[in-house]
Amino acid sequence: MGYFSSSVVLLVAISSAFEFGPVAGRDLAIRDNSIWDQKEPAVRDRSFQFVPSVGIQNSKSLNKTCCLNGGTCILGSFCACPPSFYGRNCEHDVRKEHCGSILHGTWLPKKCSLCRCWHGQLHCLPQTFLPGCDGHVMDQDLKASGTPCQTPSVTTTFMLAGACLFLDMKV
């Protein structure tokens, strides 16, 4: 955790002890009846209290070496990464994770099922899509290499394309 100067610590202690707060018609006053009139109500909200910075900084404005890909630097050494990035410095992009030679997000028929490369893993649907599979899926845990055992017919290709479009609408 960062260190605060003695003047900052003193200011926080004084503001807490005397409960400084904004007063209607004035910039800053001590909450004491001798300083402001009872006719002017005090506008006191806890959100106006002095709160020291916790060190959350935008990497674009201060520390460009802390976080990559638009991440937000926290306490000088941790990053809050935007969607699809991860790692200590937001250096990894999940959209670029492929399944071997298959690109991320690609759909392909694989041994009676329809599979998709997603975040570096090949995920296969449990339904059968190819003819000749007798209602069951063979080998769901497939590797990304290789080719399908048979070439799908035109009807099957259109059915697969429709399923892909339907599933892409859900994601």
Swiss-Prot record:
Q: Which InterPro entries match?
A: Cripto_growth_factor (IPR017047), Cryptic/Cripto_CFC-dom (IPR019011), EGF-like_dom (IPR000742)
Tissues where the protein occurs: Expressed at low level in specific organs of the adult animal such as spleen, heart, lung and brain. During gastrulation, expressed in the forming mesoderm. In later stages of the developing heart, expression is restricted to the truncus arteriosus.
UniProt keyword terms in alphabetical order: Cell membrane, Disulfide bond, EGF-like domain, Glycoprotein, GPI-anchor, Growth factor, Lipoprotein, Membrane, Secreted, Signal
The UniProt entry lists membrane topology as:
Lipid-anchor; GPI-anchor
The cross-references to Pfam families, in alphabetical order and at most eight, read: CFC
Family annotation (Gene3D superfamilies) = Laminin (2.10.25.10)
Q: Which residues form the propeptide?
A: 135-171
The segment(s) forming the EGF-like domain are 62-91
**One cellular-component annotation, GO:** plasma membrane
* Entry PTM: The GPI-anchor is attached to the protein in the endoplasmic reticulum and serves to target the protein to the cell surface. There, it is processed by GPI processing phospholipase A2 (Tmem8a), removing an acyl-chain at the sn-2 position of GPI and releasing CRIPTO as a lysophosphatidylinositol-bearing form, which is further cleaved by phospholipase D (Gpld1) into a soluble form.
Q: Which cysteines are cross-linked by disulfides?
A: C66-C73, C67-C79, C81-C90, C99-C117, C112-C133, C115-C124
Per the UniProt entry, the glycosylated residues are N63
Major subcellular site? membrane
Which residues belong to the signal peptide in this entry? Answer: 1-17
One GO biological process this protein is involved in is: positive regulation of transcription by RNA polymerase II
- Name the residues where the record annotates lipidation as GPI-anchor amidated aspartate: D134
Q: Could you tell me where this protein is found in the cell?
A: Cell membrane; Secreted
SUPFAM superfamilies from the UniProt entry? EGF/Laminin
Homology family? Belongs to the EGF-CFC (Cripto-1/FRL1/Cryptic) family.
Q: How does it assemble?
A: Interacts with the activin type-1 receptor ACVR1B.
What's the name of the protein? Teratocarcinoma-derived growth factor
UniProt organism field: Mus musculus
Name of the gene encoding the protein in the UniProt record: Cripto
